[in-house]
Amino acid sequence: MARYVFITGGVVSSLGKGIAAAALGALLQARGYRVRLRKLDPYLNVDPGTMSPTQHGEVFVTDDGAETDLDLGHYERFTGRSATKTDNITTGRIYKNIIDKERRGDYLGATVQVIPHVTNEIKNFVTEGNEDYDFVICEIGGTVGDIEAMPFMEAIRQLGNDLPRGTAVYVHLTLMPYIPAAGELKTKPTQHSVKELQALGIHPDILLVRADREIPEAERRKLSLFCNVRQSAVIQALDVASIYDVPIAYHKEGLDNEVLAAFGIEPAPKPRMEAWEDVAHRIRTPEGEVTIAIVGKYTGLKDAYKSLIEALYHGGIANRVKVKLEWIESEVFEKEDPAPYLEKVHGILVPGGFGERGSEGKINAARFARERKVPYFGICFGMQMAVVEAARNLAGIEKASSTEFGPTKEPVVGLMTEWVKGNELEKRSAAGDLGGTMRLGAYRAALKPDTKIAGIYGSPDISERHRHRYEVNVDYKSRLESCGLVFSGMSPDGVLPETIEYPDHPWFIGVQYHPELKSRPLDPHPLFSSFIEAALEQSRLV
């Protein structure tokens, strides 16, 4: 029978509920338990697929094609368990499901209301499909007091009564700010946050308190007294150098022991933390440093590239080097020479994106990398722009462009109208909806023998996650290959180009998929490990 841990947040947003949930999941896994993590998002969008990356951050794509919150990326990276579309739900999805049921007549003429219909839908989502798990950790997005989160708070309150006694625990993540003028940490924001949570009928069992310095014992006693929580369950969550130190830090503070104690479970056996300790040691004691330039268009919010950043760090962990990131807005290269920005870097990465803005800058970055022999990694849009660059400057197709930017006589990159998923043919049109209509999720690809990328993977058959609606036009394949660009990976039916490379370049690879989504600190993705290794070689030449 599954036990449930509900994680709420208070005082301010962005305290790290996702990291806390993921770290707790990793600690319970390290004790041998089977863990599932789920995210409840209060916004009205059906999913984050059409939300601006500069507002919401990255859209994390699962194997089964769901566009989800970036916290699911943390869940996967910390636990190694692949998330599914049933691990993330939004208010928009819930209301859509309810309205569809009402239109079908499923409610038999009843007046559809927030209680019980919305709350029941939330409870069903939380509790369904958990037969194979020992613990289900549910993170509730937003902050206690947000009007959007009220139905979720009510639902998890009800679950405290609906579930068998002793199978639901509430963890409240809060902030204890330091006031320089007073020279002390303040408990009042946490007291008010807990009071607001209690007013909703939820009484936290554990307080996880973020702070930038040690919390004195007297302040812990005060929180215990005023928040009605055992003193041992007031857990300090101090700032750490790397998010991969968090599982070790939380175990040291006793979070996993307190969670088990709240369920009446003896905290044995001790968690096996050797792998996490090795990762932490590699991060603390690098044997070198490389600088990677990320030429993107959403650089104003680094969370737009969250999985990408972590995957690069994973490559650094694999090679025992520190990875330093240089962020460059791609529009800069439309007006200025890339050389002054890129001459001293050891690798260039052009990530995914949508739309024409900044595209010429990405093309110029790809040209610089090709001509100067600097390691280049093009992901999704970054691969497409590398192909456009080759078409223009190697194949002499001066008007080469993408139909994403408007009509063109040389559509080197075009809209996909149909593709094979499993045994079924999927079709799309330019007039269709934007949401959920891309080529999403895991697809297989066949790699060409004796290519660099086949050597990196060590296998000719791979599966990677996609999120795109435009694709390199296979009709240009022969013209481009005659100029030295190798199409090193194709879809199994040979219709969709998946990877490209230059055999005469130290490391120039483009991929149509998003390998960063499958990288883990305990299991770095081979492409990122190889890219950082190539950057390390480049650092010895610069």
Curated annotation (Swiss-Prot):
Domain of life: Bacteria
Gene Ontology CC: one annotated term: cytosol
UniProt keyword annotations, A-Z: ATP-binding, Glutamine amidotransferase, Ligase, Magnesium, Metal-binding, Nucleotide-binding, Pyrimidine biosynthesis
Positions of transmembrane segments: none
Region (Amidoligase domain): 1-265
Notes on activation and inhibition: Allosterically activated by GTP, when glutamine is the substrate; GTP has no effect on the reaction when ammonia is the substrate. The allosteric effector GTP functions by stabilizing the protein conformation that binds the tetrahedral intermediate(s) formed during glutamine hydrolysis. Inhibited by the product CTP, via allosteric rather than competitive inhibition.
GO biological process, one term: 'de novo' CTP biosynthetic process
Pathway where it operates: Pyrimidine metabolism; CTP biosynthesis via de novo pathway; CTP from UDP: step 2/2
Enzyme class name: ligase
Positions of UTP binding: S13, K186, T187, K188, P189, T190, Q191, K222
EC id: 6.3.4.2
Residues the record lists as binding ATP: S14, L15, G16, K17, G18, I19, D71
Positions that bind L-glutamine: G353, F381, G382, M383, Q384, E404, R469
Active site: C380 (nucleophile), H514, E516
Annotated Mg(2+) binding sites: D71, E139
General remark: CTPSs have evolved a hybrid strategy for distinguishing between UTP and CTP. The overlapping regions of the product feedback inhibitory and substrate sites recognize a common feature in both compounds, the triphosphate moiety. To differentiate isosteric substrate and product pyrimidine rings, an additional pocket far from the expected kinase/ligase catalytic site, specifically recognizes the cytosine and ribose portions of the product inhibitor.
Protein function: Catalyzes the ATP-dependent amination of UTP to CTP with either L-glutamine or ammonia as the source of nitrogen. Regulates intracellular CTP levels through interactions with the four ribonucleotide triphosphates.
UniProt-recorded name of the protein: CTP synthase
Originating organism: Rhizobium meliloti (strain 1021) (Ensifer meliloti)
